[in-house]
Regions:
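C-terminal regulatory or interaction extensions
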Residues: 145-146, 152, 226-234, 263-265, ...
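A residue-level signal for conserved active-site and pocket-lining positions in enzyme catalytic cores
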Residues: 65, 110, 151, 202, ...
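Conserved ATP-binding subdomain of kinase catalytic cores across diverse folds
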Residues: 42-162, 211, 267
Length: 314
């Protein structure tokens, strides 16, 4: 059975890789542009862009793309551009298997819990290999730049210090700089709880940003979500930054204390946990429908059962 690379649902007769409605959501066109590269011939281009790092997201090639409009009768295609591209492509890596499938699935799981994410999908290289693609929210349709600053910048830390700090500190920065601080603080803690539930220990300072799409600074839609516990099972840390002074052996009381300290009341905190509890069945369905290999399906199911029991049933 052929499935849509965007929504994981079965394709209809004559459809290739995407439903038309799904292609429009990510590519703003009913037909997906072609991606005329393979992993082998893109490696040299990737080396020019990727900075050396030992983190999962750091070792992923992040290539800036835009859509080249073909002449009459020719299909649109993606081309690698400079920093001003409207799309970011993450190919497979040699070190960690199935990161594109992992990230796309985890982003869908966030959406199922009511978390707003950047537009994203899987896409194929010319040889059929799957990649992850996302459309940037800090670019206009014409390629112009929308002001955006991550928490490294707002906390005046260097990029290499992105793992230094706490989630409580990010909440304070959101309260200080957001035009809608109460809403954005709730949205922020939703992402932190979701990341813990899905085994994501890589949500560092650069993975949270404020942007200004319409004369107000707001928390951006969520990006860079993936399960590092599935990709790197040897890592025993549960979070990238500290929560209540620690990165592992986290429990519900740690989250509740941090949320209260940032201004959330008990009713809002309770609703947040209830929302995730309701999303668990949909998460299991998405995992089963995803493009991850069957073995990783099983590992993800098992992890969600474990983390949800620890956090949502206490």
């Amino acid at each position: 059975m052929c499935k849509c690379l965007y929504c994981y649902k079965p394709l209809g007769e004559g459809e290739i890789d995407y439903h038309k409605r799904c292609a429009r959501k990510i590519f703003e066109s009913g037909t997906a542009p072609t991606l005329p590269y393979t992993r082998d011939n893109i490696k040299e281009l990737a080396r020019e862009i990727v900075s050396a790092s030992t983190t999962v997201t750091g070792v992923q090639a992040k290539l800036s793309l835009d859509i080249a409009r073909g002449s009459a009768g020719e299909p649109q295609r993606f081309t690698i551009v400079g920093l001003w591209g409207r799309y970011i492509l993450k190919p497979q890596t040699d070190r960690f298997a199935n990161l594109p499938e992992n990230e796309d699935l985890t982003m869908h799981m966030a959406e199922a819990a009511g978390i707003k994410t950047v537009p994203h999908s899987l896409i194929r290289f010319a040889d059929g290999e799957l990649c992850y693609i996302t459309r940037r929210v800090d670019r206009t349709k014409s390629g112009g730049k929308i002001a955006m600053e991550d928490m490294c910048q707002l906390s005046e830390r260097l990029t290499e210090d992105k793992y230094k700090g706490s989630y409580e500190r990010i909440a304070k920065l959101i309260r200080q700089y957001s035009s809608a601080p109460l809403l954005d603080i709730v949205n922020f803690w939703e992402v932190i709880v979701f990341s813990w539930l899905t085994g994501n220990a890589d949500m560092h300072l650069k993975n949270f940003s404020l942007y200004c799409p319409a004369n107000e600074y707001l928390l951006t839609p969520t990006y860079d979500l993936l399960s590092t516990a599935i990709a790197m099972p040897e890592d025993d840390e549960e979070l990238a930054l500290t929560l209540n002074g620690k990165k592992k052996r986290i429990d519900r009381l740690d989250f509740e204390k941090a949320m209260r300290d940032s201004g959330m009341d008990d009713k809002a905190i309770s609703k947040l946990f209830q929302r995730f509890a309701k999303a668990i069945p949909e998460w299991h369905l998405l995992i089963s429908q995803s493009f991850l290999p069957k073995q990783l399906h099983d590992e993800y199911h098992t992890m969600i059962d474990s983390t949800s029991k620890r956090l949502l049933e206490s």
